[in-house]
Design a protein with these regions (language model features):
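Multi-bladed beta-propeller domains
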Residues: 1-7, 37-62, 88-105, 130-153, ...
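A flexible loop/linker signature enriched in serine peptidases of the S9 family
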Residues: 1-8, 23-45, 56-62, 76-86, ...
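Conserved beta-propeller blade repeats
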Residues: 5-23, 53-76, 97-117, 151-167
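Alpha-helical structural motif
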Residues: 8, 29, 121, 141, ...
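A structure-centric signal for secondary-structure junctions around beta-strands
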Residues: 17, 30-32, 48-51, 82, ...
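Generic "edge-of-domain/loop-turn" microfeature
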Residues: 18, 27, 40-43, 71, ...
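Hydrophobic alpha-helical membrane-insertion signals
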Residues: 109-114, 119-142, 161-179
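Blade-level signature of beta-propeller repeat domains, shared across WD40, Kelch, NHL, RCC1
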Residues: 158, 162-203
Length: 204
């Protein structure tokens, strides 16, 4: 779909199916966020267009994820010296909102609720509720979803939300000093019911 000597890592499709967000590793600016337009259809064939830069800074930005309505992109960046999760309007320009506290990576939007799930530096899942009004994005304070720690593989996300927002699959790290000999995938049902049980005061 693209021709580049720079490494490119796809992350998410826009809901309209015609835009692909990806990370490109450049020698001068590091990891940048890019968008690839794609025209055509199944009958006539798909035709990739020219990639455009969504965000390029002297810092590293990674994992651009389109919101379910296509109006926002969540990603993580080390502009503060620590990787944090941010949200920007798409296609921009506009503001920038940091939704994580004390570090974060691998944001995933819930398709069923105004929630973003991400991984914190302690390899735990965090959940952020948000409201979006026009060009304004207001995140709530992050809250811990579970005391379980994810089994982390560098460069890979170890969890994902089901489209119904009720189930989550994740790889859990072994307890204590046990050595991992075989990875296990855990499938969580009624994800947000469990979240409300652990934090009764959390919004519905």
């Amino acid at each position: 779909m693209t021709e580049s000597l720079d490494p490119q890592i796809p992350s998410s499709w826009h809901p309209n199916g015609k835009l692909l967000a990806f990370t490109q590793v450049r020698p001068d600016t590091g990891n940048d966020l890019m968008v690839l337009p794609i025209d055509g259809d199944e009958a006539s064939g798909w035709r990739p267009g020219k990639p455009s830069v969504f965000l390029s800074t002297p810092f590293n930005e990674l994992e651009p994820m389109f919101s379910p309505d296509g109006r926002w992109i969540a990603y993580y960046s080390n502009e503060t010296g620590t990787f944090e999760v941010y949200v920007r309007p798409f296609p921009g320009p506009g503001g920038r909102w940091k939704i994580s506290i004390d570090g974060g990576s691998y944001p995933v939007w819930s398709r069923a609720r105004h929630e973003i799930v991400y991984q914190d530096p302690e390899h735990q899942l965090m959940v952020v509720s948000y409201t979006a009004d026009g060009d304004s994005f207001t995140p709530d304070k992050p809250r811990t979803w579970s005391e379980h720690r994810l089994l982390v593989r560098p460069g890979f996300r170890s969890f994902d939300l089901h489209p119904d927002g009720e189930r989550i699959a994740l790889a859990i790290a072994p307890e204590g000093d046990r050595v991992v000999t075989q990875d296990k995938l855990v499938f969580m049902v009624n994800f947000f019911d469990e979240l409300r049980r652990l934090a009764p005061g959390s919004p519905r």
